[in-house]
Amino acid sequence: MYSLGNQVKAMVITLRDGTKREFEKGITVYEIAKSISDKLAREAVGGKFNGKIVELNTKIEEDGELEILTFEDEEGKKIYWHTSSHILAQAVKRLFKDVKLAIGPAIDNGFYYDFDTERPFTTEDFEAIEEEMNKIIKEDYKLERFVLSKEEAIKFMKEKDEPYKVELIEEIPEGEEISFYKQGEFVDLCAGPHLPSTGMVKAIKLLSVAGAYWKGDEKNKMLQRIYGISFPKKSMLDEYLHMMEEAKKRDHRKLGKELDLFSIHPEGPGFPFFHPKGMIIRNILEDFWRKEHIKRGYQEIRTPIILNEELWKRSGHWDHYKENMYFTEIDGQTYAIKPMNCPGAMLVYKSTLRSYRDLPLRLCELGLVHRHELSGVLHGLMRVRSFTQDDAHLFMTPEQVEDEILGVINLVDYFYKIFGFEYHVELSTRPENSMGTDEEWELATNALISALKRANLPYKVNEGEGAFYGPKIDFHLKDSIGRTWQCGTIQLDFQMPERFELEYIGPDGEKHRPIMLHRVIYGSIERFIGILTEHFAGAFPTWLAPVQVRVLPISEKHHEYARKVYERLQEHDIRVELDDRNEKIGYKIREAQLQKIPYMLIVGDREVEEGNVSLRSRKDGDLGPISLDNFIEKILKEIATKAL
């Protein structure tokens, strides 16, 4: 415990584990970390005091809750990577004097900095920049924060000839604090927080360079964006770089082309074209989704893609989402292509008088939505402009909320286990600007927490990060190389039932407002296929594989028997191809392996004579002779059990 001798212990700090400790006012976050353990002090990168991210040198002056942040925390990574972006900018300014600075934030996987330069950067420049960055780290500059008035800040950045910084400062509302951070000779406009010094960054690497429009607007100048990553240990960097190499091999855009699953064309950027094999995977996912939902009392609906502007004004999308929507004129009126399925489901609910006996009402929809994304952020199937959301909207009474949430949690868990995904859960609570009463928020948040506890699911709390219309649970999948993907969401929504004046007749004969729960499992069918492609590296489990078996006759004289084998498999709805080309068997096997087909059935003289097949597995190689009946029994069982 932090020793105060005989001094007065003036405040109580509640730590991450719930323990309360007394400290004198003015103690820093770092000193509190050191009082807990030397190890924690060494690993600490910042703090979270009463929900606000603070620096290690921040003085605590009042009672409150404090989490010491390390690199293991998402907020800790953001602090670490934010400082790393400043190290990058300082190195670039040292080497390329005429470069102008734009912005340099921490992102989900590292950091970037945008530069305006006449000579585009190339990866050949990285060696010199990294060398300079390592010098800056070795020089161990303190990061010193200072504040200027708006007028002073503009003058300061004009003197430094940094037009992008001047533009940013001019956009800051009057009266807001304008802060800067200095490290050595380098100064940047920045709100922080940061590490205490550059020397705390132990391993840093530049990853790539790309073009990026200033403020993401295609009408603005194209800047040069350098991406990087950093870690507190070199071993962590090495592990990450290995993962990145593995990710390149698994890139769904590369595999999508090689396996003939989908394509994207300049005639429709962000609008994927699914090929026959890609459609097989898609249809399997959708059929499985439908079957499991019907089993659990859901009813499928289909709502129009284009709806009148009045609907979007009522739903709130017109005010909050208009710039991401596409519009068209019909009969002199404005219509929008739907960016979300929710308003359509509201109209279905509202189409008839509902009783409490009808609730819970579970409406599900595989709804095609369109959202305008800037061309620079489009990425294969992961970030598109047109996609299918596996939405469901559940309408219920207050008494039913917890059970309905638990039902959705169990369904999400069932789905992810089928695909072999581990996952973690995050609960996002009420933000400062929210709609709905205190009672509604308390009911909703407690119901989410209680359902998570009943499901025995550990969860992380993101205080104040819920939507303004309700708290939510997010499910983050972990793929086979350790990356996480946010897919499933359970979102309680107070806004839609209110805006659409949804009602049901209660047992008291009076009208009541239902509670609505919005949820997705896949998130987007397209993105989920992209994730699965990378998770399995294109080697889909047999039940999902577009082609499950390829029959390979050794020579032309085996074609007749091979066709009989092919037809027998077809009779059992096994997805099979016959490769009867005049090619050597070794070539045919290699090609089937490159296509990642689960099973090859090779037929030659011996197989024709004995009436069986020679089995070769994608996973286990040559498995020798097997009767066709036994193989059919084996593969049908594998498909039925959805074996991985």
UniProtKB/Swiss-Prot annotation:
Protein location: Cytoplasm
Keyword 4Fe-4S part of the UniProt annotation: no
Record's cofactor remark: Binds 1 zinc ion per subunit.
Principal localisation: cytoplasm
Source domain of life: Bacteria
CDD domains the record matches: TGS_ThrRS (cd01667), ThrRS_anticodon (cd00860), ThrRS_core (cd00771)
A single MF term (Gene Ontology): threonine-tRNA ligase activity
Presence of keyword Methyltransferase: no
Entry EC number(s): 6.1.1.3
Keywords associated with the record: Aminoacyl-tRNA synthetase, ATP-binding, Cytoplasm, Ligase, Metal-binding, Nucleotide-binding, Protein biosynthesis, RNA-binding, tRNA-binding, Zinc
Pfam families per the UniProt record, alphabetical: HGTP_anticodon, TGS, tRNA-synt_2b, tRNA_SAD
Domain TGS: 8-70
InterPro entries hit by this protein: aa-tRNA-synt_IIb, aa-tRNA-synth_II, aa-tRNA-synth_II/BPL/LPL, Anticodon-bd, Anticodon-bd_dom_sf, Beta-grasp_dom_sf, TGS, TGS-like
Catalysed reaction, written as an equation: tRNA(Thr) + L-threonine + ATP = L-threonyl-tRNA(Thr) + AMP + diphosphate + H(+)
Residues bound to Zn(2+): 342, 393, 518
Cofactor(s) essential for the protein: Zn(2+)
GO biological process, one term: threonyl-tRNA aminoacylation
GO CC terms of this entry: cytoplasm
Subunit structure: Homodimer.
Reported function: Catalyzes the attachment of threonine to tRNA(Thr) in a two-step reaction: L-threonine is first activated by ATP to form Thr-AMP and then transferred to the acceptor end of tRNA(Thr). Also edits incorrectly charged L-seryl-tRNA(Thr).
Family (UniProt): Belongs to the class-II aminoacyl-tRNA synthetase family.
PANTHER family xref list: THREONINE--TRNA LIGASE, CHLOROPLASTIC_MITOCHONDRIAL 2 (PTHR11451:SF44), THREONINE-TRNA LIGASE (PTHR11451)
HAMAP family from the UniProt entry: Thr_tRNA_synth (MF_00184)
Name of the protein: Threonine--tRNA ligase
Organism field: Caldanaerobacter subterraneus subsp. tengcongensis (strain DSM 15242 / JCM 11007 / NBRC 100824 / MB4)
Gene: thrS
